[in-house]
Amino acid sequence: MIAGVSAACGLLLAASGVAHAEVEPGGWSSESPGFKVQERGCGEVDDLTFKLTCSTASGDQRAERRYDTYTGGTHQFEGYFRVTSMGGTRISLKQTFNDTDGDAGPYFMLAVERGGRLYAVHGGDTLSNAGTVGATVRVNTVHQVGKEHRTYINGSLKHTVDSPGGSFYDKFGAYRTGSGNGPATVEWSNVKFWRK
């Protein structure tokens, strides 16, 4: 009996070290990249609450976390967001940003319109209509650097785009797109990162 309990405890301990990614399971290691808070224009950050307090439709209006740069490999982001107020529209929620010399700039941007439409800023593809005020939405991005970038909404694959090689980083929060404006408040939770 004691041997059986010891074996069971050993299995539990071994299992607790496994990094369980919500999509595309297998072979992931959890990681905790550092980040910097970015507040510009009327952007305000309070832990995982991100606000654009103005209706300005020009200039740099952002409230975000910018995570450390990665190069090569496969990286998965997961987070849950809830739009708690949306007086504006076309607010970017999650970005994968190219940090490669000569190619730096937004590579993938997930944004929300008033009414709940979630879309890819580059190309305009609709990913979901789940981003309504008050709804909690899970976002996963899987980025195989040099191959492709995949976006999942509530566990379902919704968008795939080819990826160049180089260096990238993740951002999330609330950011006015070129055709957008606030005000808006977005709460994020349960943010996790993995790599393989």
Language-model-derived ranges and their functions:
Residues M1-A21:
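Secretory targeting and sorting signals
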Residues E22-E24, T69-F81, M86-D99, D162-K196:
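Ligand-recognition surfaces built from glycine- and aromatic
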Residues V23-E31, R114-N140:
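Short, aromatic/His-centered strand-loop micro-motif at the edge of beta-sheets
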Residues W28-T49:
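Extracellular glycan-recognition surfaces and repeat-rich motifs
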Residues G43-V45, T49-G115, R195:
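Secretory/extracellular carbohydrate-interaction modules
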Residues K51-S58, V121-L127, I153-L157:
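Secondary-structure transition/turn motif
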Residues D103-F108, D125-N129, S156-V161:
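Surface-exposed loop/edge segments in extracytoplasmic proteins
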Residues G134-R150, N154:
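Localized edge beta-strand/strand-to-loop motifs within extracellular or lumenal beta-rich domains
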